[in-house]
Structure formats: C-alpha cells, structure tokens
Amino acid sequence: MSNNDIPKDYDHTTEEELQELWQRDNTYRFIGDGTKPTYIIDTPPPYPTGKLHMGHVLNWVYMDIIARYKRMNNFDVLFPQGWDCHGLPTEVKVEEIHDIKKNDVSRETFRDYCIDLTHDNIEKMRLQMRKMGYSQDWDHEYITMLPENKRRTQLSFLKLYNKDMIYQDIHPINWCPRCETAIAFAEVEYKDNTTKLNYVNFPAADGSGNATIATTRPELLCACVAVVVHPDDERYSNLHGKTVKLPIYNREVKIITDETVDPEYGTGVVMICTFGDKTDVEWVTRYDLDIIDAIDEKGEMLPVAGKYAGMPIKECRKAIINDLKEEGFLIKQEDVDQNVGVCWRCKTPIEIMTKKQWFVAVKNMTEDIIEQAKSMRWVPDHMYHRLENWANSMDWDWCISRQRIFATPIPVWYCNDCHKVVLPSEEQLPVDPTIDQPDHACSCGCTSFTPEEDVLDTWMDSSITPLTIADWPNPGWETVYPATLRPQGHDIIRTWAFYTILRCYALTGEKPFDELVINGMVFGEDGHKMSKSLGNVIQPEAVIDEYGADALRLWSANSVPGADVPFGWKDIKHAYKFLRKFWNAFRFINMHLDENVPEELSGDNIIDKWILSKLNRLNKVVTDAFEEYNFAKAEQAIYDFVWHDFCDEYIEAVKYRLYEDIDSTADAKYTLKTVIETTLALMAPITPFFSDNVSQYLGKESKELHIGGWPELHEEYIDDDVELIGSYAIDIIDELRRYKSSHGIPLNQLLNTVNIYTEDVKKIETTIDDIKNTNKVDNITVQNGKPDLREKVISMEPIMSKVGPEFKQHAKDIISYIASNDPEEIAEKLEKDGQVIVGEVAFTKEHVTTESELVSQTGEVVDILRTEEFDILLEVQQ
C-alpha cells in the first residue's frame, strides 16, 4: 500500500472501526466443538454501576491479554462477560435517584426501579468495555437478575439445603443499620478511628466499693449482662462472685472471671453487653448469659434503654455520658485508637444483633476449602496464604440472608400449620415466594403458607460463576468445568475466591478453577487509592479520548500481578509516544516494501542476522512471560527491542541498502518485514488495535492476527556470536553518529578517514561495509593493537583567580611569560620539572589551564572515540 494512503501520524480514533469489525466478524466467538484445546476464563461479574473505573481497566486488561494470547496460540477461548446485578449498591442508588427508602413503595415497584437502572448501566459498561478492546464473547453474557440465573442460584440453594449445608438459626450476626440488613463477616471492613474510653464506676451491690470499668460503648449499659475480670488480677480478687449495680439503670449483674480479659487494657474490668463485639458473643455463649436487645434494625435505641429509647446510637452515647457525669459515675475519659467494623458498601459502623437468619455451614468445610485452594496455581503464589488465613480464622458460619428486595429470593415458604420449611420442586424454579405458591402441599397436608421475604446475599449468585458459564446443570456442562483461570483482585479473596471454592466444591466435588491471577488496586498520582472523596480519580474515558485504549492498556500491562499500581499520566504519554515511534517506523518501512520481498533470507549480512537473533530471543522472552502472566516483563522486552534495537539501531543501519539497489537490499526488506510483522503479533495481546491496524496495512486479515497468529519461534536464528559481532558494529555506528551530531556535522556528510583499532580485527571485518555506508565514511581501515598518539598542547592560559592572589606583584611576569612562550614547551617543562621558574617565583600545573589536541604518528590532528572493544580515530574535519 502506498504511503499516501497511510496517515502520517498514528491516529487512535481508528480504534472504533476495529471494534465494529471484531463484532461483525465474531472474531472472539467460543466454538466449543472440541477441535481445539479449550481455555476457560471465569470472568468477574462487576456490579453494573454504569462506569468502568481504573480497577476494572487493570483487571480486564490482565484477563484480555491472556485470552488474546491463548487464541493466538490456537486455543478455543471461552471469555464470557457476567453482571452481578443484585445487592446494596443498586438499591442505594435507586433510593438516591428516587429520593425514597426501600419500604416507601411496593416491593414490585422498587424492584422494577432496580431492574431499569441495571439494564441502563449494563449497556453503558458494555460500550466502555468495547472501547477498551476487551475480547469477550458477548454470546456468552450472563446477567444474574434474569430468570435463568436466578434459577441456577436457587437450585444451588436447594441442593446445599438437602445436604444439610444450609440451615436456619437464631444467631448473632453483623447488621448494617444504614442498609437495614444482615451482612457476612467477609463484608465487614475495618477502619481506624479515635474515640473516647470512658471510665465508669459500677457500685458493688453490697456497698463495699466500686468496680471501675472502661468502655467505648456506654450506650450499651442497658444491655450489660455481666462484668468480667481476669482470674489472676489481684486488684479485683475481692470482687469475684459479687454483683454490681449498673449506673442509671440500677440493675444488678454478676462479676465473673475469664482468662481472655486483658488486665492492661483500661482498668482490666470489662462489661459484657449484647453485643459490643465478637468477644461479647463468645462470653455470652460460654457462660450462658442472657441476651438483651438494645438497638433496633435502624440503629435506634429500644425501650430497654429507658429514657434514651428512640435515640440514634451516637445521640444516645452523648446523652448517657452527660448523665453519667452529672450523677458522678464517670471518673474520666481518654482518647483511644480502635479498629471499627463498618459495612463495606456504605461505611456505616456495624452492630452485632441476634436474628433468625439463613446460614451456609462454612466451618465444617474449611479443611476441604484449603485443600482445594492448595491444588490451584496462585499468581503470585503468596496470595494463597490470604485465603488460607481467612479460612482458618472462620468461627461463624456464612450468613446468606439479606433484608433487602433486589436480589435472588430465598426459595422458601413456612407451613402455617406445622411451621415446617417448605421448598419448591426443582422444576418450579425460579420462584419468588412473595408472589408464587409452592407446587405441592406441605408434608402435613397443609396448603397455606407464609413466604420468606428475605433474599440471598449477592455472593450466592456470583460464587457459582464457574458453573454459570458452564451452563450447569444442563447437559454438557462438564465439558467446560472446571474453568482454567480465575482473574480477580486481592481485595475479594476472602469473599469471591473463598465462597466460590466452597460452593462449587460442595456442589460438584471438584475445584472450580485451575489457576488464579490476582491483580492489585489502582492508586492515584498522589500515592493514595483512587477515591472520589480524595479527588484523585481518573476516568478511563479521559485517557481513551486523548491517547486511545492501547496507551491505557500499555499502562495496565506494565505491572506485576498482586501488586498495587500507581496511575501516572507520564506513563500514558510515554506509551503513546512509543506507539507513534513504531508507527513512524512502519511508514518508513512500508515505503520500501513491494511485491518483490523475498520469502527467506539469502545472504549473510551480520546486521540482518543480529536483529533476527534478537527478534527470536524476544519471541522466547515474551512467550515465557505471558505463560508466567508476567505482563510487565513482556511489555518491557518489547519496548526495549522496538525502541532501541529495531528503530534506533537496525533501521538506521540498513537505510543505505534501501536507497541503493545492491545485492543485500532484498534481504534488508525481508528482515524489516519479518521484524515488524513478528513484533506486531507479539504486541497484539497488549495493543490489539495498533497491531491490527498496522497488520492490515501490511496485507494481513484481522482474524489471521488474532486467531492462531502467534509467531513461530525460529531457534536456529538465535546466535550468541552473531549478536556479539552485530553489537560491536552497532556500537561503532552509534559512536560515529554521536560524533557527527556533537560536532554539527550533517549525517549525510562524508567523513574522510576512520581508523579502527582492536585486539581482533575479526570482530568487525564482516560488518565494515555497514559501518562505512551507514555513517558515510570515505575510507575506513581496521588494525590490530592500539593507536600511536601523542597529546599536543596548543594553548595555555593562567588561572587569574590563583595567580593574582598568590604571586601579587610578580603575577604580571608569569602572565607575560605564558603569553610569549610556546605552550608545548611550557607543558614539557611542567611535566619534567613540576614547575617553571620566572624571576623570583615559580608556577605549577595548578596555576594554568591547557587546551590540547591529539596528533597521529604521521602528524595529522585526530579525534578518538572509544568503546569497550575499539579505539576509533577520525581526522579532524577542517
């Protein structure tokens, strides 16, 4: 193709045309006919918020690189896209948009609001994903709010219930007062907080004194069921077995002992209330203490709080502290740092409440989960320990019921006669118990039921994604299960990874995937995690519009799995500069390519063999790096090769062969075409738009590149000796080019004579023509040994700042002497005697500056350039 038809500069706006081409051609369709090895990616289903953020970009670039690399290596890749629709984020957004709470409208109306918003957001995110060049097979898209996926989730519930792995019980659970729902421990985040530690006197019931407790939760005084001290704490040995009265409430509670009390914290006296934290739960269970509910689902005090009933928690805390002060019970307050558990969605501090909820029996399966996790490949491998540590820390089962609306309904009714749990048949699924009735009577014969109104934790949908993409339980699901790869962030190892291994293993007896690649978080340029509140968020569209998706993909790929990644505009600009440099190289090469480019190398030009050796070594490095999921290593190797070896060195070294019709011209064209085509293919998983765009100009169909287009490795081209000899020639060429540049000599101006000295002329005798013609040298010689040179001093000047102060009235004599004598003779005297005497004084080398030139054995003035292996002499151009 003529260069007249190719834009002068790289135009990233062509990316949109390629997106349309890939969709139109079904380039990334999963075939599934067994004719190729399959590679299955268990793609994360994001919440449909309507916007991709940089964390999405990073995660999906990782998996897209892998998908593209595998397709290019003739794998049949299943790269689906799912949407985890249900849960709090959508409900919270709907409440915000419509200025309502979930209970202000009917369940059906609220659910419809959520569905409409979700559909809109999914469509927005689909478009953004396509702009990024992600190669999902959109025929394998799943949306968790659709009936077929609700059926799958509910079926998994029935199967685990029938295995006694799901049960209902009254148990302490984590509760979010803002979202008004139970949440699992994995959904609790911890943030640092400074609060007041309040020292409060509890009077002994027998009047013998006080027990001073230290608490950060005085609002829970009404729910205090005991006071506890360490059995070996001698300060309180006289209190063992006694009772104390609660301030304000005047109710008596026992003083008990427990070895888990920290005597160093506060006063060493702790009140047990229901419930301040998990330790309270353990003590209440251990000592069979009463449970007093003090806070309701909205985070307001219950009637047991007396005059504080109806107050929000913070308001009650403030009021009760004031009353404790007034009544003389509050001894002092001091600041204390603590980790507060908050809801991971709305960041509201969680409360522990006792509720009847549905649970998955996790604790009985932790050993199985760890065993399955160990059998998988983790990249990086230390991420496995996050899951192992989480599994070993589990002391509560997974609470899966939620008091929300927009989620998969729990498929349960309760018989109004015998109160048994009634389940639907598998054929009836999916069901909404608030709308549907079971398709059979209760075992007692009753046909009157009360529906379960709670819904399932959204992780119940997303923790079976390997089964979802396999179309479980429909025939043939086993052919694409388990998945090959689970790509995900390290922040959801304890949720998505843990729950998926648990549920899929419980349902199938097999692990859900073979490998996990873990990505980190994205940080802003200020070094903090990207956050709206910090104002450091960069929207992907802002980068794509200005620099294109491939520049953003290059930034993403230049990172290490598991590590957090800082965003930097300078990295984006550098990536774009790289693409423009390669584009310019392509335009130059294309100008010289024609239908006569040979199919193979016919000559022995070392520079050609040098670049082909380095090209195939690059192929090997990049292939190994992709197999190891080390994208940064692959990208950096490509950068270095394209920028330096190919553009800066090889192209410059062969230009003369392209402009002259000589024997080696055809080989130069073959080599240029081979290098650019191979490099574009190696880059294609990272920069699919750029590689496809240029490849089409070079005559390759889009599918040829993306399907089966990974370049063949030619080991026979890799030659250490060739690379060494080629590097010698490149070093000399570089030195001569730099010399011309630094001396203001045009690159196309002839150099008269260049003499090269070395210990072994064989190192460069095969590359003399390339050195000579690349640098426009008229005469070039190569000799063994070192050059015979002498340094000639051509001028000498006194250093006035030293001569004046030191020699005072004699300074003029020294200045006159230096000006009137041959600088070469003065230099010889200084070298021989160390000084020159002028009248009553003498000066040394430290009193003068000199300018010298090198002179060859035959008297010519020369410049010398040095590399590690060579001395290069040039006659000074007059």
Give residue spans per PLM region.
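N-terminal, positively charged nucleic-acid-binding surface of large information/translation enzymes
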Residues: 2-232, 256, 273-305, 324, ...
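Feature 926 captures the class I aminoacyl-tRNA synthetase adenylation module centered on the KMSKS loop
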Residues: 199, 394-459, 464, 506-549, ...
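Structured ligand/cofactor/substrate-binding pocket environments in proteins
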Residues: 55-67, 74, 83-84, 152, ...
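Phosphate/diphosphate-binding loops
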Residues: 315-340, 732-735, 810-818
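Short, glycine-/Ser/Thr-/acidic-enriched flexible segments
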Residues: 46-48, 85-86, 181, 190, ...
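Short hydrophobic alpha-helical segments that form membrane-spanning helices or hydrophobic packing faces
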Residues: 170-172, 224-226, 354-355, 468-470, ...
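Extended, non-catalytic structural segments that build the interaction scaffolds
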Residues: 5-6, 109-117, 260-278, 372-388, ...
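Active-site-adjacent bridging/hinge elements
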Residues: 35-43, 65, 98-102, 126-133, ...
